[in-house]
Amino acid sequence: MKTFTKLLALAGLTFITMVSCNNNSESQKADIVLENIFSRKSVRKFTSEPVSDKQVETLLKAAMAAPSAMNSQPWRFVVVNDKEKLASMAELLPYARLDTAPVAIVVCADLSGYSKFWTDDCSAATENLLLAAEAMGLGAVWTAASDEERSAIVKTALELPETIHPLCIVPVGHPDGEFQPKDKWDPSKIHYNKW
């Protein structure tokens, strides 16, 4: 009977340890994700170190993991890694920060299908891309391309089909310098149950 009691106590202790470790593991996962979100910053200056094709693919996989209305996945991406193309676009789009970026990812939407919420869907994809870049030690910044003037420049430069509309350009590279995230927490912007 003593042996059975000891075994039962040991089994109980093992179970408690497993549950505790599992909870600790979940807590660690949450901490890692939250740390990545709070560490994300806009990087506008890059070293000459290239971004590998594998890194670009990982960024695009992260972007495509975003939610979309009715699972429509309207996003399309144009990867620009040609130095001359980047330089010519940088001249026309000075706010796109393409002058030192080794690669830029243009986030677009295909408006030929269900596209009522394309800006929401492509924005979610862009945020995933930015968070993935942060997690990978890369720098990136969201630069607008959806207004009429910038959109026309991007459409012409990249020879986009009529149904493809750019949302933003995300220059990506290895940060040149120390960039710090901004603390944007502001409880005064939060309302509960009514304004």
Predicted features and spans:
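Acidic, surface-exposed loops and disordered segments
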Residues: 2-8, 15, 19-195
